[in-house]
Amino acid sequence: MLVGQGAGPLGPAVVTAAVVLLLSGVGPAHGSEDIVVGCGGFVKSDVEINYSLIEIKLYTKHGTLKYQTDCAPNNGYFMIPLYDKGDFILKIEPPLGWSFEPTTVELHVDGVSDICTKGGDINFVFTGFSVNGKVLSKGQPLGPAGVQVSLRNTGTEAKIQSTVTQPGGKFAFFKVLPGDYEILATHPTWALKEASTTVRVTNSNANAASPLIVAGYNVSGSVRSDGEPMKGVKFLLFSSLVTKEDVLGCNVSPVPGFQPQDESLVYLCYTVSREDGSFSFYSLPSGGYTVIPFYRGERITFDVAPSRLDFTVEHDSLKIEPVFHVMGFSVTGRVLNGPEGDGVPEAVVTLNNQIKVKTKADGSFRLENITTGTYTIHAQKEHLYFETVTIKIAPNTPQLADIVATGFSVCGQISIIRFPDTVKQMNKYKVVLSSQDKDKSLVTVETDAHGSFCFKANPGTYKVQVMVPEAETRAGLTLKPQTFPLTVTDRPVMDVAFVQFLASVSGKVSCLDTCGDLLVTLQSLSRQGEKRSLQLSGKVNAMTFTFDNVLPGKYKISIMHEDWCWKNKSLEVEVLEDDVSAVEFRQTGYMLRCSLSHAITLEFYQDGNGRENVGIYNLSKGVNRFCLSKPGVYKVTPRSCHRFEQAFYTYDTSSPSILTLTAIRHHVLGTITTDKMMDVTVTIKSSIDSEPALVLGPLKSVQELRREQQLAEIEARRQEREKNGNEEGEERMTKPPVQEMVDELQGPFSYDFSYWARSGEKITVTPSSKELLFYPPSMEAVVSGESCPGKLIEIHGKAGLFLEGQIHPELEGVEIVISEKGASSPLITVFTDDKGAYSVGPLHSDLEYTVTSQKEGYVLTAVEGTIGDFKAYALAGVSFEIKAEDDQPLPGVLLSLSGGLFRSNLLTQDNGILTFSNLSPGQYYFKPMMKEFRFEPSSQMIEVQEGQNLKITITGYRTAYSCYGTVSSLNGEPEQGVAMEAVGQNDCSIYGEDTVTDEEGKFRLRGLLPGCVYHVQLKAEGNDHIERALPHHRVIEVGNNDIDDVNIIVFRQINQFDLSGNVITSSEYLPTLWVKLYKSENLDNPIQTVSLGQSLFFHFPPLLRDGENYVVLLDSTLPRSQYDYILPQVSFTAVGYHKHITLIFNPTRKLPEQDIAQGSYIALPLTLLVLLAGYNHDKLIPLLLQLTSRLQGVGALGQAASDNSGPEDAKRQAKKQKTRRT
C-alpha cells in the first residue's frame, strides 16, 4: 500500500520519501524502518468554524491514548499514523460545547480490508454550538441548582430544548445552530427577579446576554420548651450585608424591651413562632445572617438556647438547626484587678466547677440559664490570683458582686551568655523575693531550665536577688544587678532581668606598611583549652581589635603572621572588674621565601628605588629565603630557555607569601622546507585538552628575512655615506658610490617557527598553504622539559592541484562533490558561494578526479567543453528538512501536506528531506507526525507562489521512548502474535501502550513517557493460546533512553509435555552415559535416546500430554568386568506440562579377585609337576604346557562373555526389576 496521495508528478531531481509500506504487528528492533499506515479524513461543517481548535485522538479499545493530532485550518483534513494492527477508537475532541456526528468511530485495522488500509476517509460532521448561561442568586456570583430553563426561537412559544441548572447555577444547551434565541427560567417556590434573557449564536459557543436572577430563598425553624411547641417567641434577624428592602415577608418594626449585646449587628426584621412552634422568613437573599430569639415574661427575660445563631443562606431553601429551647434566666457580674480597679478581660469564671464563661474587654461576664440556688464562683487569669466566693443567686439578683484580684505574678529571666568552662554548668538557680516589710518572710523559687522564674505576690514593695554558687563566682560568673527592686500594684510585674557581666579586651596592631589580614588569639592561662581567635583585615598601617564577652582571669594574647617579624608576638593581660585596653603589637620586618623548580638566573630589584638595587642571581633548584627590612614591591624576572607561569613575578610585602617559580613551558623549534615561496601557515595542536590550537603565520622564509636584513643594512650604510659626504665636501660627492647587491631569492626556502610546550606535552604540527601540499602532512613530537628541546620538527612542501568551476546562472548553495576516480566515497564536499563559484584545492597532482553537483529542487548538467562548470534549472515546490534536536536528519516522520484538492502523506528517509514539486499556487497546510516526537513548528499554513521554491526546516524533539524485547518459549523458540502491553503505575496509571510480537518474537512498545514506571506484561485478551508468562510482568522505569532486552518466557496452552533431567555422577563417566525413554508397555525399544556428552543435564523433545506411562533409563558403556554399578530408572505419567528427573550413577571399580581365583586352581597341579619335573622332565614339560594353555583359553572365554553382557543384561534386569515411580 502506498502511504501518500498526491497530485502532480515528482521532478527528476527531487528526492522523495514515497515508499511502499506494509502494516505489521511490530516494527524492527531499532531504526527508522518502522511500518506505518495513515488513517485520515475530514471534519465537515455547513457553517463557518475554526478547524484548528479541533483535535482528533486515537485510543485503544481499553481507553489508552495512542496518538493525537489537529486538523488542517483550511479544509479540516487530518491524518493519524498507525504502527500496529488491532482494534482502535477514533474520537473527535472539539472545543467544549461543539457537537459532532459521530463523536467516535471504531476501527478494526487488519492491514487488508479496513478503511484506513484502503485509503478511505473518516468524516465527522458538525451539528452545532453550545449556549451557556447562569441563574444567579441576587448579589452573588453563583446560583442554585434545580431551576428549569427553556430555549426557544425569538418570537415563538415552542420550546426547542429544556434543561435544569447545575450546582452553581450553570446551564447549557447543545447542538444549537446559528440564530437568535430566548431563554426563560421557572421555579415552583422561589421568586425570580430576572426570569428571561436572550442569546445570539454566530460561529462559536455563545453566552446568554445576561444572567437570570433568583430574588431569595425561604428559611424556617422551630422552638420548644420541655418538648412542647412554644408560641409567641420572637426571632430577630440581623445582617451586615443584606438590606431591609431585599427581605420579603418579615416585620421590620423594632421589638420593645430588646437590648442587643453586639452593637455591630444591623437589625432587619423579626418573625413570631406559631402554634406549632415553627417560624419562617419568606424570602431571604443569599448571604450571612444572625437570628436572636427573644422571649420576655412579666418580670424577667428568659433565656432561649441557643441565644444567638449565625447561619448562611447560599443557593437553596434552609431549615435552621438546631431547634430552639426556652431555658432559665441570666445574671451578670464583673472581674476587677483591684477594689476600684479596671476590668480583667479574658478571665475564666467557673460556676460550681462546671459552667465556665470568659469575661469581655471590660471584665464583665454573663451566666445564662441559671436557676435559683447557692453557687461557688471562682475566677482564673494567668498571672492574677483570686479567692473563691459563695453566693446565692435568684431572679431578683441579676447583678453579682465584683470579683477582685488578691495577688499578682512577679516574673523574670536570668541571661547567661558564657558559662565558665572550669565548673559544671547549672541549669537552675535559686531566686529570693524579699519584702520591704521586715515582718514578712523570704520567698525562694528555682528557675526552670531556660532561666525563667515567677513569684506570687500581694501588692507591696519588694526586691529580688539571685543566689549564685561560690564556685561559679570564683570562676568569673557575675550577674548584674545584684538586687532588683520592684513595686507590685494592680498588675503583674514581668520585666525582672539579671544579665551576666562580661569584659572586653582591646588593643592595636602597628605595621610597617599596610597590615592586610592578621590573626589575633586570646588564650586563657588559668582555663586550659579556652582559646579565641579574631581575624583582622584592612589596608592601613594600624588596626585595632576587641575581644568581647571575656570572663575575668589571666590571658595570653598573640598575633599570628609567620611571614612578618614582631617586637612582641604575645602579651599577658589580666581581666578583673574592668575592660582591658592598650594592648599593642608592633611589626619590625618582612621575610621573602622563593621556591624554584629549575636552576635559573633571576633579576631581582625593588620598584621605585633606582637601578642601584638591581641584582642578578644564579639560583639553584630549591627554596631561598630573604630577609627584608623595608616594605614595598619587589620584581623578580626569570631568564631561561624555559618559560614560567609569568614573565616576571611581583612580591608585595603587604601580602606576604611563598614566591614559587615553576617552569611550565619549553622552547620547541621547527622548520618547513618548500621548493616554492608561498604563504605557509602552521597549526600546532596540543594533547592537552585545555590548550587551544595555535596558528602561526603566514610565515616568512629565512631567505626573505635575510634579504630584508640586507636591504636594511644597505639603507643604513647609504644614509651614513650621505651624512659623511655632506661633511667632506663636494669633491667626495663627485665619486660614484659603490653599488651594493642583495642575494637573489632562490629555493629551497626554509620557514622557521617555534612553540612553547609543557612538560610531557605531545604536539601535532600541521602546515597549510593555499597552493602547497606537505610531506608528511603533520608531525608529532613529545617534549620532556628537562632541557631545551631544540629543533624537533622538519617538514617539506610541494605545489598542489586546484579544481575550480561555476554554476550558470549564478546559484548559491549547490553541493559540489569531488571524488578520486574509481573511489566509492567522496573526497571533498563544498558548496558554491553567492556568485555560484567554487574552488577546491590544493589536491595531489598525480591523481585523477571526478566532479559532480546537486541541489534540492534543481537539475544540474555539466557544460560541454568545460571541466567543473554546470547549468542549473530550477523546479517549483516545497522542500522540508526534518531534523532531530541534535541537528541530525530524522527519518520515519510522516509528513501530511494538504491544500485544495491536493493531499499527500509521505515518510522521510535517512536524509530527513521531503520535496513536493510542481505544486499549484495556493495555501497548503503541513503537519509532521511521528510517535514519541513533538515538532516545531507542529503545523503551519504556507503560501506557495507560482514558480516559488520554499525550504522549511522542522525540528523534532523526543518526548517519549520505546521498550524493546522478545517473547519466547522455554526452549528459546520465538513466539509470534503475542499481545503485549505496558501499563503505567502510580501517577502514570492513565497511560498505557500495546503491541503484538512479530515472527521473530520481538516487540516494541512505543510512546512510554519519561519518569513513569510501567509493567510490561501479556494482555489479558488476545492470548488464548498462552497459558502463563514468566515473569508475570517486568517493571521498567523510563528515563531519557530506549529500554532494551525486556524478555519474557511464555508457556503455550498446547498438548505438549516437556521432559528434562540431570544426572548426579562424576564428570569422568559422562561420555559413557546415555538416557533412554521407553513407553512402559514396551521396554525393548526406546522411543528417544539422548547422549549426555559433557553436560550433567539432559532434555528430551516435547512429548504429547496424553497421560501415558513412561520409563526413563540410564544406560552406560562402562565394562562390568571392571566396574560394579546399578542403572537407575524412573517411571512417570505424562500429566501436566513438565517433568524433571534426577538420576544417580555411582559405579565402583572392581578389585582383581577373579585373577587370584583362577591362579589358585592351577597352583597345586603346577607345584606337583615342578616336583616331578626333576625325574621325568622330558615327558612332563610338554604335558604341563598343554594344560596351562587350555586353562587360559577357558578364562579368556569367560571374561569375554562377561564384557559383552552389559546392555542386554540391563534390559532383562529392567524387565525383572520393580521400577521406581515419581
From Swiss-Prot:
<comment type="subunit">
    <text>Component of the back of Sec61 (BOS) complex, composed of NCLN/Nicalin, NOMO (NOMO1, NOMO2 or NOMO3) and TMEM147. The BOS complex is part of the multi-pass translocon (MPT) complex, composed of three subcomplexes, the GEL complex (composed of RAB5IF/OPTI and TMCO1), the BOS complex (composed of NCLN/Nicalin, NOMO and TMEM147) and the PAT complex (composed of WDR83OS/Asterix and CCDC47). The MPT complex associates with the SEC61 complex. Due to the strong similarity between NOMO1, NOMO2 and NOMO3, similar interaction pattern probably occur for the three gene copies.</text>
</comment>
<dbReference type="Pfam" id="PF23196">
    <property type="entry name" value="NOMO_6th"/>
</dbReference>
<dbReference type="Pfam" id="PF22898">
    <property type="entry name" value="NOMO1-like_1st"/>
</dbReference>
<dbReference type="InterPro" id="IPR013783">
    <property type="entry name" value="Ig-like_fold"/>
</dbReference>
<dbReference type="InterPro" id="IPR056187">
    <property type="entry name" value="NOMO_8th"/>
</dbReference>
<dbReference type="GO" id="GO:0030246">
    <property type="term" value="F:carbohydrate binding"/>
</dbReference>
<feature type="glycosylation site" description="N-linked (GlcNAc...) asparagine">
    <location>
        <position position="50"/>
    </location>
</feature>
<dbReference type="GO" id="GO:1900108">
    <property type="term" value="P:negative regulation of nodal signaling pathway"/>
</dbReference>
<dbReference type="InterPro" id="IPR055073">
    <property type="entry name" value="NOMO1-like_9th"/>
</dbReference>
<comment type="function">
    <text>Component of the multi-pass translocon (MPT) complex that mediates insertion of multi-pass membrane proteins into the lipid bilayer of membranes. The MPT complex takes over after the SEC61 complex: following membrane insertion of the first few transmembrane segments of proteins by the SEC61 complex, the MPT complex occludes the lateral gate of the SEC61 complex to promote insertion of subsequent transmembrane regions.</text>
</comment>
<keyword id="KW-0812">Transmembrane</keyword>
<dbReference type="InterPro" id="IPR056188">
    <property type="entry name" value="NOMO_6th"/>
</dbReference>
<dbReference type="InterPro" id="IPR013784">
    <property type="entry name" value="Carb-bd-like_fold"/>
</dbReference>
<dbReference type="InterPro" id="IPR056191">
    <property type="entry name" value="NOMO_12th"/>
</dbReference>
<feature type="signal peptide">
    <location>
        <begin position="1"/>
        <end position="31"/>
    </location>
</feature>
<dbReference type="InterPro" id="IPR056190">
    <property type="entry name" value="NOMO_5th"/>
</dbReference>
<feature type="transmembrane region" description="Helical">
    <location>
        <begin position="1156"/>
        <end position="1176"/>
    </location>
</feature>
<dbReference type="Pfam" id="PF13620">
    <property type="entry name" value="CarboxypepD_reg"/>
</dbReference>
<keyword id="KW-0472">Membrane</keyword>
<dbReference type="Pfam" id="PF22902">
    <property type="entry name" value="NOMO1-like_9th"/>
</dbReference>
<feature type="region of interest" description="Disordered">
    <location>
        <begin position="1198"/>
        <end position="1222"/>
    </location>
</feature>
<dbReference type="Pfam" id="PF23193">
    <property type="entry name" value="NOMO_3rd"/>
</dbReference>
<keyword id="KW-0325">Glycoprotein</keyword>
<dbReference type="InterPro" id="IPR008969">
    <property type="entry name" value="CarboxyPept-like_regulatory"/>
</dbReference>
<dbReference type="Pfam" id="PF23141">
    <property type="entry name" value="Ig_NOMO"/>
</dbReference>
<dbReference type="Pfam" id="PF22904">
    <property type="entry name" value="NOMO1-like_2nd"/>
</dbReference>
<dbReference type="InterPro" id="IPR051417">
    <property type="entry name" value="SDr/BOS_complex"/>
</dbReference>
<dbReference type="InterPro" id="IPR056319">
    <property type="entry name" value="NOMO_7th"/>
</dbReference>
<keyword id="KW-0256">Endoplasmic reticulum</keyword>
<dbReference type="Pfam" id="PF23192">
    <property type="entry name" value="NOMO_12th"/>
</dbReference>
<dbReference type="GO" id="GO:0160063">
    <property type="term" value="P:multi-pass transmembrane protein insertion into ER membrane"/>
</dbReference>
<protein>
    <recommendedName>
        <fullName>BOS complex subunit NOMO3</fullName>
    </recommendedName>
</protein>
<feature type="glycosylation site" description="N-linked (GlcNAc...) asparagine">
    <location>
        <position position="618"/>
    </location>
</feature>
<dbReference type="InterPro" id="IPR056189">
    <property type="entry name" value="NOMO_3rd"/>
</dbReference>
<dbReference type="GO" id="GO:0160064">
    <property type="term" value="C:multi-pass translocon complex"/>
</dbReference>
<dbReference type="GO" id="GO:0005789">
    <property type="term" value="C:endoplasmic reticulum membrane"/>
</dbReference>
<dbReference type="Pfam" id="PF23194">
    <property type="entry name" value="NOMO_5th"/>
</dbReference>
<dbReference type="GO" id="GO:0043022">
    <property type="term" value="F:ribosome binding"/>
</dbReference>
<dbReference type="InterPro" id="IPR041033">
    <property type="entry name" value="SpaA_PFL_dom_1"/>
</dbReference>
<dbReference type="InterPro" id="IPR055074">
    <property type="entry name" value="NOMO1-3_2nd"/>
</dbReference>
<keyword id="KW-1133">Transmembrane helix</keyword>
<dbReference type="Pfam" id="PF23660">
    <property type="entry name" value="NOMO_8th"/>
</dbReference>
